[in-house]
C-alpha cells in the first residue's frame, strides 16, 4: 500500500506543475520529496507583467504571511516549504501576491494541495441499513461510509442492473445517507464509493421478494398485526450481518 502511494506521488509529481492564474499572477506547486510524516513542496509565484524588482509574498489560508522574497530578474519566485501530514488538508491553502513599482498583483487563485499530498484510495466501504415505515410505505434507510479515502468521496446508491439511483458527496469522514422506498426497487442494491484515485463497492444487499413486500405493505396499512414486519426486518438485519462479514473478509 505504501509503495502504491509512493508510486502515485511520483506519477503526480512527474505530471509537472499545476498552475492557476488570476489578476496577473500565477501560483504553481510541485511535490519535491515525500517523507513518512511530511512533504517538501516547491511553490512558485509568477507575475510576468510586473516591473523588477518584485516583492513576492506567499500567503497561507486566512491571509497569514508564510514567506517573502524579492526578485530582481524575470524568473518566478520559488518557496521551498515543509508540510507536516498532521495539518488538516483544508488548512493547506496558499496564494501569492506581488508588489512592484508597476503596482500590486493578486492575490492569486487559492491553491489547495491535498490531492497530491494525501491522495488515498477509498477503502473498507461499510453499508448499514434499517427498515423504516415512511408515509409512502416501507423504506430502507442506508448509510454508507468508507473508513478512509482522500480527496473527498462520492457515494452512489446502485440498484439492480447497476443503475445509479442516487448520489451524494458528504463532508470528509461523514457518511452518505440514502433512502430507498421498497416499492420502487427490486432485486438488490449496494453502495459504491469513488474518489479520484479509487473505487470500492459494498456487498450486494438483496431486497425481499414481491410477496413478502405485499404482506409488509398490508401490515403497514394497519390491517394485520405487526409480526411479519418484524420477521422481515429481522431477515434484513441478518443479511446486513452477513454482508458486513463478507466485507470484512474481503476488506483490504
Ligand atoms: C523538511 O523536512 C525534512 C524531513 O522532515 C528535513 O530533512 C528537511 O531539512 C526539512 N526542510 C526544511 C526546509 O525545513
Ligand atoms: C448522514 O447522517 C449522519 C448521522 O446523522 C450525519 O453525520 C451525516 O452528515 C449525514 N450525511 C449527509 C450527507 O447528510
Curated annotation (Swiss-Prot):
Query: In this record, what's one Pfam family?
Result: Ig_C17orf99
- Give glycosylation sites per the record: 82, 177
The conditions that induce or repress this protein are given as: Up-regulated in the mammary gland upon the onset of lactation. Up-regulated in peripheral blood lymphocyte B cells upon activation.
Question: Where on the tree of life does the source sit, at the highest rank?
Answer: Eukaryota
Free-text tissue specificity from the UniProt record: Expressed in bone marrow, spleen and lymph node.
Molecular function GO labels:
cytokine activity
| First and last residue of the signal peptide | 1-18
**What phenotype has been reported when the gene encoding this protein is knocked out?**
Mice are viable and reproduce normally. Show reduced number of both peripheral lymphocyte B cells in the spleen and precursor and mature lymphocyte B cells in the bone marrow. Show smaller and fewer Peyer's patches, lower numbers of immunoglobulin/IgA-secreting B cells and an altered gut microbiome. Exhibit reduced levels of immunoglobulin/IgA in the serum, gut, feces, and lactating mammary gland.
Could you name the Gene Ontology cellular component terms for this entry?
extracellular space
Q: Which UniProt keyword terms apply here?
A: Adaptive immunity, Cytokine, Glycoprotein, Immunity, Secreted, Signal
A GO BP entry: adaptive immune response
InterPro entries recorded for this chain?
Answer: Ig-like_dom_sf, Ig-like_fold, IL-40-like_Ig
UniProt-annotated location(s) = Secreted
Q: What does this protein do?
A: Probable B cell-associated cytokine that plays a role in the regulation of humoral immune responses. Involved in lymphocyte B cell development and immunoglobulin/IgA production.
Name used for this protein in its record: Protein IL-40
- Species: Mus musculus (Mouse)
Amino acid at each position: 500500500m505504501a509503495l502504491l502511494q509512493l508510486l502515485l506521488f511520483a506519477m503526480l509529481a512527474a505530471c509537472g506543475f499545476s498552475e492557476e492564474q488570476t489578476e496577473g499572477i500565477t501560483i504553481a506547486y510541485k511535490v519535491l520529496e515525500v517523507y513518512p510524516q511530511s512533504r517538501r513542496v516547491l511553490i512558485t509565484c509568477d507575475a510576468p507583467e510586473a516591473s523588477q524588482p518584485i516583492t513576492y509574498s506567499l500567503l497561507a489560508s486566512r491571509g497569514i504571511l508564510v514567506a517573502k522574497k524579492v526578485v530582481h530578474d524575470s524568473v518566478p519566485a520559488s518557496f521551498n516549504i515543509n508540510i507536516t501530514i498532521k495539518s488538516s488538508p483544508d488548512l493547506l491553502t496558499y496564494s501569492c501576491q506581488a508588489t512592484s513599482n508597476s503596482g500590486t498583483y493578486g492575490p492569486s487563485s487559492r491553491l489547495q494541495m491535498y490531492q497530491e499530498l494525501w491522495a488515498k484510495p477509498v477503502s473498507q466501504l461499510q453499508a448499514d441499513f434499517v427498515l423504516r415505515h415512511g408515509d409512502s410505505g416501507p423504506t430502507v434507510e442506508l448509510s454508507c461510509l468508507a473508513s478512509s479515502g482522500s480527496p473527498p468521496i462520492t457515494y452512489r446508491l446502485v440498484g439492480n442492473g447497476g443503475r445509479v439511483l442516487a448520489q451524494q458527496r458528504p463532508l470528509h469522514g461523514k457518511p452518505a445517507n440514502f433512502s430507498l422506498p421498497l416499492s420502487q426497487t427490486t432485486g438488490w442494491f449496494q453502495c459504491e464509493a469513488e474518489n479520484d484515485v479509487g473505487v470500492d463497492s459494498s456487498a450486494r444487499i438483496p431486497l425481499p421478494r414481491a410477496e413478502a413486500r405485499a404482506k409488509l405493505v398490508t401490515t403497514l396499512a394497519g390491517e394485520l398485526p405487526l409480526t411479519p414486519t418484524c420477521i422481515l426486518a429481522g431477515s434484513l438485519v441478518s443479511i446486513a450481518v452477513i454482508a458486513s462479514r463478507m466485507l470484512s473478509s474481503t476488506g483490504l
